[in-house]
Each structure stands twice: as structure tokens, then as C-alpha cells.
Amino acid sequence: IIYVEGHPFRTKTGELTVEATRFVMLTKSLRALPDKWHGLTDHETRYRQRYVDLIVNPEVRQAFVRRSKMTSSLRRFLEAHDFMEVETPMLQPLYGGAAAKPFTTHHNALDLDLFLRIAPELYLKRLVVGGFERVYEMNKNFRNEGISLQHNPEFTSLEFYWAYATYETLMDFSERMLRQAAIDTCGKAQITCQGEEIDFDKPFDRLSDREAAEKWALGRGIGGIKPGESHGKIMMAAFEHFAEKKLRQPTFVTDFPLEVSPLARKKESDPALVDRFELYVMGRELANAFSELNDP
């Protein structure tokens, strides 16, 4: 890296540059950077030396910028609607809030085994019980499980709780929040991802778990079903196996079976179902929410 003083001018080819009158070396590079024309293509090196990836691949640098814009937008939206940001414990004596395997550690001074949290849910609920009616946390979770394009042992999640709101209120709220995040991040509500245009501007599609399963799974066999499995779990398996990947545009899936939603409130119109939704975009689950079961 060098510091240059001089006067701007254009070359014979019209390129804007600087006629240097003074330069100072600010720092040396002891190792040569990858070829700027071909970039850094080795995936192992890109993941393990992300700083080099940022130098030579502008699109990766832009992803960091977009992530910062997105998280800032989410925070502004929540705080504009009277949500308070909190931080809950990372080290917990008991883990909960999700079905996942935790990382374990040991506190030497207390001679106590602890777990890195897998979710902030239980502590956020305690804050609601304590009188904070709108709280959220955007922070790290840790799950000692496999690695894939959709799963990482360390990841950031946004979790919020709104006392006295229904899951239908949360659907409307989440739709507006994500639409605003797309605009603040990309300058418009329509974004292109992996060659597909995703439209956050139009109303999100809504269909029930049963409707999705009937649309894409009816008449098709599912392997791995245990004898005596409940109707609700079979419906969920059919949805996950056949329907999930078909949900490309932003879509709320509602009315999940009671058997696969133990902490959600039963629907008053059908006690076999619950007041719950999941949001899907490009075949991936982005959100899971429900009206809490507060009278078991």
C-alpha cells in the first residue's frame, strides 16, 4: 500500500489517474497477491483466508457491505416499532429453545459444566414475563452439528417476541420488515439471487401446510415412514420432501400439525392444527413463528 500526492489528469486512452509528485510506502506485502485478472478461485483458500478473498474478489466485499446494511435495517425497523434490543447469556447451565446438539465447556472457577447456547428463546421469554413486552436479539447461536450450505456450527439469528400479538400479526409485521430490509440493502424490493428474481414488493403468498402437501406431494410416495406414524408427522414429511423446494417467491406456510409444533397454541377452529407459520424463499426456510402456548 502506498500514499501518493499529485495532480489528477487523463491518459491518452481517457483513463483518470494521478501525476505523482510524491509517494510514501505505507506497508509492504511480503507475499504476492493472487492474480487480479483470474482472482482467487480455490474454495479452501477463500474460506480459510477470507481477508485475501476480500482483496481480490469485489463481489465478496460487496456481500459484507450488504450484510451490514441488512442488519442495520432490521434493527431500525424493530426499534421504530418499540422493540428493545437485549443480550441474553451465551454460556448456559441448561440449553434449550431448539432441538440441537450443543457445544460444551467447563467453568474452572465454579467447577461447572456449561453449554454454548443453541437459541436465546428461553431467556427472551423470561424478559417478557418480567414485563418487557417487545424484545429482540440479533446474535450468535452455536450448534454442534453438520456443515452444509444451509447449516453452520456458528451462525447469527434474529429472534423477537411481542406480547399479546397473534401469529397473523407477526406475519404482516415480518413481511413489512423484510420488504424494507430488501429496499435498504439493494435499493429496491426486487432482488436477483442465483439467477432468480425474488420480489419482496408484492404481497407474500400464503398457503397451509396441507395445501402445499396436496399441491406437490399428492399421490407420491415417501420413504422412511415408520409404522404407526401419526397423520401430522406424515403430512410434515410430505411437505418437507416435496413442497419446500417449490416455494421460490416469499411464501408463508401456515396451519402446521399439532404433533410437530409442541410449543405452539392450538387453533381455535381446529385443535389438530396450531397458530404457526414458516416463511420460505428460494426453497429455504427463513423464519419460524407461532402464537405461544401459554395455557398447557
Feature roles, as predicted:
Residues 23, 78, 82, 212, ...:
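Conserved hydrophobic/aromatic pocket- or pore-lining residues that grip, position, or stack substrates
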Residues 1-169, 179, 224, 261:
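Class II aminoacyl-tRNA synthetase-like tRNA-binding/catalytic domains
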Residues 70, 120, 131-134, 170, ...:
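Alpha-helical structural motif
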Residues 96-102, 180-284, 291:
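Metal-assisted phosphate- and nucleotidyl-transfer catalytic regions
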Residues 116-119, 130, 134-141, 152-157, ...:
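TRNA-recognition modules of translation machinery and tRNA-sensing kinases, especially anticodon-binding
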